[in-house]
Each structure stands twice: as C-alpha cells, then as structure tokens.
Amino acid sequence: MSPLIDSLFPDQAGRQSRLYVGIVFKALKILIIVLNCSLPSSTTSYSLKNGSAINSHSPIPTMPLITLEEHYVSPAVRDANPATRDLYELFPPHILSKLESLGDERIQDLDKGNVSLQVISHGPGDGSPSACSAANDGLAAAISKNQTRLAGFAILPMNEPSTAAKELERCVKSHGFVGALVDNHLDGKFYDDERFWPVFEKAEELDVAIYIHPTFASEEMMGHYKGNYDDSVAMALSAFGWAWHTETGLHILRLFASGLFDRFPKLKIVIGHMGELLPFQLDRILAQSERWGKRDRGLREVWRNNIWITTSGMFTLPPLACLLQTTSIDHVLYSVDYPFSANEKGLAFIREIEKSGLIAGEDLEKFSYRNAEALLRVKAKAS
C-alpha cells in the first residue's frame, strides 16, 4: 500500500492500492491539463529566432526574463522517501523528464520562452539532511555548467531546523545559492512555531530570500476536503484546485501574527501564484489584523517591506490587476512554474501584459527581471 495514498485517504485503507493510484493519477491529469503546456492559441503564430520562441505579432523582446518558481526533482530526495517516490511516479513521462533534466532539455525549454535566467528549486517533498545535501550538491553541479542561465534555491530538512539553517548557510556560501524554497508546512505544522525560526534567523543574517511553496495536505488536513463527490475532487481541492493557495496565504498571516517579522524585521519572504489569494482579501485582513495584539509593525508595513510575490502558474490579467492595486510593483515578479506550466505560456502572458498596458515601460522591466535581480543579487542577460 502506498504511504502517500494512505495519508490522503486513510479511512479507505481496505481498498486496493490500484484504485488509489487511479484517483490520484486522475487528479494529477487535471493539474497537467490546467497548468502544463497549455500553450497560446493556435491563432497566434510563432517563429524561431536565435533558438527562442517569438510571437510574430509582437515586437521581439530585448529585455531579459527571470523566473523564480521553477522546479526539478532529485533522485536523492525522491527515492529516499516512499511517499515522495510514489507521488512523482504518478506524473506523465514528459513531465518527469523535465523535472529530472538540469541540462540540455531544460535549457532548450528556457529558450522557447525567452527565459534568460531560471532559479531552480526542488518540487514538494520532505528530505532528510543527507538527502537535501546531496540534492543541493547535484543542483550546484548542474548550475556550474550553465551559470548564466541557472541559479538555485536550496531544499532544506525542515524537520531539523538547526540543521536546515546550517544547510542554508552552506548552500549560500559554498554554492552561491540565492536562498531556499520550503514546503508550506511539515505534515501540517506551520512555521509560526518558534522551533522553525533558526531557519528564518539564518536567512535574515545571510540576507537571502525564503520562498514558501504549496505542498500536499497532511492526513489531518485531508479530511476537511472530502465530501459528497469523488475522491479525485477531494484531492484536487486539497491541492492545486484550492488549498495550496489558501493554506499558503494563511501561513503568511500566521507568521505575521506570531511576531516573526518583528523578531526578524529584514526577513525576505516570497510567495507565488499572484499572492496565494491574499491580495483579493488584503484590505479586509489589514483592518482585522489591527486587533491581533501589539506589533512593532503592522501587517501593511510587513506586506510592503517583507513580502515579494511572483505570478507563477497564473497567466490572466484580472488577478494581476488586483495584485498591482495592493502591492508595490517593486515586489511583483514574473515566474512560470515550470515544468507544470510551459515557458511559452509565460511568454504569451508577457505579450498580453504589454498589449494591455497594465504594466509598461520601466515597471515592465522591474516585473520581468529587475526586481529579481535586486532581490536575489543576480544578473540576467537579454535573450
């Protein structure tokens, strides 16, 4: 029996494991259909110039593009945990190939979307200290072969926060990583618990960003999403269909309420997916947060100074407009969510933004690459 499926559907342990695999695979197929390789309409023509996919109805871009929420999977992490291995075995072969590639296939896909620099991070999954170190060393080796195109976020063993802080320091100082990407929770435990704070303390000390990324529901969380519908729907609601975003948004509020940002006022936190639903509710949350007890700084100031937001996996104008009305353009960054979304789809979104005028001129440069350069201290070259 799959440990992953047991955790997702513990009250159905008597069913055959192949049924569980079918349920999760069906849900993952929905995710792939929605997010991955949903390329621009066939009415938009493309031509190739210098190996890059170009929309022939728009000017050829001269500015660089940097993406920040772009994934890979290391065998060191995947194969060390049966649940993680089971999860990744459910993905279609072409997605697995892209997740496992840190070489030619990845670079070719960057060219297709005019991506100048991709910041790579591990996909969801817990890792032991040794597995995380091995994964980080492997990523560093791959980056060394394409230093102008690739950068790295570390994977950290969050179950051992002191060790995780040391691994973050090692990766930044020895490998030149630009921060870390961590799962949104550890089996349902959020990082407002002070036992996790050594990681944030170290990130502030090193002046690097922590990217908080959605992950799959714990067994306890999963029960909240089951109902009078198929288990594949429950799976989707607990993950990419809803809870990935609400739970990550909730996490940011928990971190604020716990006093984390008062303890570490220079901390840099990144979240994706247009702000994990927070921008839509921000005014209401700001008003309510004034009743949450005395803070050195209010939520508005924390939002303005400590939170950066990427557009990963989101390619429509209405949520971007909402984000821009609540957040300084200096803290809004382009991303794709590769390989679950295609770089070409991101490029088409850049075209749509240009055409709409929603972001233009110097602000478009900030969104596309300058903000990432400033936050991560990297440099990108135009395609």
Predicted regions and their residues:
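Hydrophobic faces of well-ordered beta-strands that scaffold small-molecule active sites
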Residues: 66-68, 118-120, 151-154, 180-182, ...
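Active-site gating/metal-coordination segments in enzymes
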Residues: 116-251
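Mid-to-C-terminal alpha-helical segments outside catalytic/metal-binding sites
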Residues: 4, 8, 51, 57-117, ...
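Active-site-proximal loop/turn and secondary-structure-junction residues that shape catalytic pockets
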Residues: 72, 124, 156-158, 186, ...
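Aromatic-lined glycan-binding groove of carbohydrate-active enzymes
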Residues: 256-259, 265-302
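Active-site gating loops and adjacent loop-to-helix segments of metal-dependent hydrolytic enzymes
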Residues: 62, 71-100, 218-246, 285-306
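Histidine/acidic-residue-rich catalytic or RNA/ligand-binding cores of hydrolases
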Residues: 77-78, 130, 221-229, 275-290, ...
